[in-house]
Amino acid sequence: MVKPEPKIELGKDLINILDEKGINPTAFLWFYLPDGNTWRLVMSSPSLDKDIKKAYEDFIKEFGKEVSVKAIGLSNISIVPGDNNLLRLLKTAIKTGRGSIGGVRFTSNIVNGVLIEDAYIYRLV
């Protein structure tokens, strides 16, 4: 089975939109899920941390019609709290600047004994 590529440009479009709307994610990345051979767009922001379920519902209402969100697919987007285990693990290995929209491919790395098969990181503060 061929591993798909993350939708890098669509993710970049979406993080720009979120920044413009004042969401300012502190974590925004594609994470590869090998069991399903799919990518998940993972994001976190202090403004979304209080109630993740409500944050996701609000996200759908405000951004669900955005072209980038439709192309990515809502089922491929996860909003997680800032203290999420995956984010904490990744932050031990890599961080980007606050407000930056980088492009760091993080492939086949072991962090604290955990294999990170693939990730594409725009922002991780």
Regions found by a protein language model. Give the residues of each.
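Catalytic "initiation/cleavage/transfer" segments centered on a nucleophilic residue
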Residues: K61, A71-V125
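Short edge beta-strands and adjacent turn/loop segments
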Residues: G22-W39
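N-terminal presequence-like segments and adjacent domain-start helices
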Residues: M1-L10
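A short interface-forming secondary-structure element
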Residues: V42-K54
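Short, non-transmembrane alpha-helical segments in secretory-pathway proteins
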Residues: L10-I17
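Short, non-transmembrane amphipathic alpha-helical segments
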Residues: D51-I72
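Short, flexible beta-strand-to-coil junctions
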Residues: F31-P34, P46-S47, V125
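Short secondary-structure junctions
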Residues: I17-T26, V67-A71
